[in-house]
Amino acid sequence: MKKIISILFVLCLCMAASAQQHMKFMGIPLDGTVDSFALKLKAKGVTYDAAQSKAAGPGVRVFNGRFMAEDAIIRVAYIPKNKMVFSAVVELQYPTVESAHIPFLNLTESLQKKYPNTTPEENLGPDGDVIGLAFNIPDETGDNSIGFILQALKPSSSGHGVSIFLTYTDMDNFLKCEAIVNEDL
């Protein structure tokens, strides 16, 4: 009996050690279905924007809420086939580049404090210009990446002013998404 209990204990330890760690957005793991993720956002006071979600198309749901004490637009990306969440983008809008400068620097500093084991790298836009920073987020051991955060300053989605975009992506679910999309090839 002791041998069986010992074996079960070792198996439980192995399962716990191999449990996948996921990237988090607003304290919510970027994992599970979009419906489950939406409920967790709702519990944080975030509201669903049906009109913007419909305009965004399949694989994206749009929400409005607060992020770092500011009004924000939150877009959650998921795989339409199985509704698995893999990314969340927060947009903070400002009237001018100058008005976004200090918040951008403050966000950079906050990310560096929260993730001290990562060094931000330049985030390049499609034309090769630097538009922000990229943070590769390691797991607890520091051996593997659980995801990445892209911080960018770009024209606002509203067409007025500029926005700081923070894109949180879970590496494991992003790779699953790519595999599912590539099944169509």
Question: Where is each model-derived feature located?
Answer:
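Short N-terminal signal/transit or membrane-insertion segments
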Residues: 4, 20-21, 82-85
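Non-cytosolic coordination micro-motifs
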Residues: 20-56, 92-185
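N-terminal cationic amphipathic segment used for targeting or macromolecule association
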Residues: 14-17, 86-88
